[in-house]
């Protein structure tokens, strides 16, 4: 599982080139797919913030502080996990970062193994969040009839019973069921039930 997670993007955003280079080297040694940026705007203008991944942010940078980058990610409903690094950390700053949803907060210099573990935790959470976002988007795209049929499928009712309850043809139920499975990338009723459970 960690190998699949490690293929997800990890972004390092720090204005200090030597720190970017050392973190990039360190994280690549741990098998991560790393891209570095020297400031918040270049990261936000280039990286795909809608996909699963993790961003390691310096809290104090020119142009945009790490907290401002994080606020932007939250406002844009990004799935990226956030880890803060700081050279001048204090307890209130760490508490604020964690309350805003950051995975962790480290003071420089950071131990490689600790950062790698935090990134794996972040990537796992980010992947779950990205999947949930996709499912929520799929749910919003459902017609009212598809929502009714989905609820009845989740209740364990068969096609004929659903058709009888909704006064529609069995073939119509089959078409809607196929559409639901396609929209949620679910091959079985169990997978549909799992997705439905995530949404509720």
Task: Kindly label every feature range from the protein language model.
Residues 6-19, 23-27, 40, 55-58, ...:
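Conserved acidic segment of CheY-like receiver
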Residues 36-54:
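Acidic, metal-coordinating helix/loop segments flanking the phosphotransfer/catalytic sites
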Residues 38-39, 64-69:
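Acidic catalytic/metal-coordinating carboxylates
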Residues 61:
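Receiver (REC) domain active-site loop signature in two-component systems and cognate sites
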Residues 90-92, 110-119, 165:
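C-terminal output helix
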Residues 181-200:
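Basic, Lys/Arg-enriched C-terminal extension of HTH/homeodomain DNA-binding domains
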């Amino acid at each position: 599982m960690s190998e699949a997670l490690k293929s997800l993007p990890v972004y390092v955003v720090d204005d200090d080139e030597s720190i970017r280079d050392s973190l990039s080297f360190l994280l690549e040694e741990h098998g991560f797919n790393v891209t570095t940026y020297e400031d918040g705007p270049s990261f936000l203008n280039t990286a795909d913030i809608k996909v699963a991944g993790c961003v390691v942010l310096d809290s104090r940078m020119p142009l945009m502080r790490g907290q401002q980058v994080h606020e932007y990610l939250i406002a844009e409903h990004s799935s990226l996990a956030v880890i803060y690094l700081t050279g001048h950390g204090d307890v209130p700053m760490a508490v604020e970062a964690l309350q805003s949803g950051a995975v962790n907060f480290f003071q420089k210099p950071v131990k490689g193994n600790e950062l790698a573990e935090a990134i794996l935790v972040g990537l796992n959470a980010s992947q779950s969040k990205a999947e949930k976002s996709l499912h929520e988007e799929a749910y919003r795209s459902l017609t009212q009839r598809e929502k009714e049929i989905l609820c009845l499928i989740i209740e364990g009712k068969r096609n004929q019973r659903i058709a009888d309850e909704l006064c529609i043809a069995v073939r119509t139920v089959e078409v809607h069921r196929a559409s639901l499975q396609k929209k949620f990338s679910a091959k079985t009723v169990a997978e549909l039930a799992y997705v439905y459970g995530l949404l509720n």
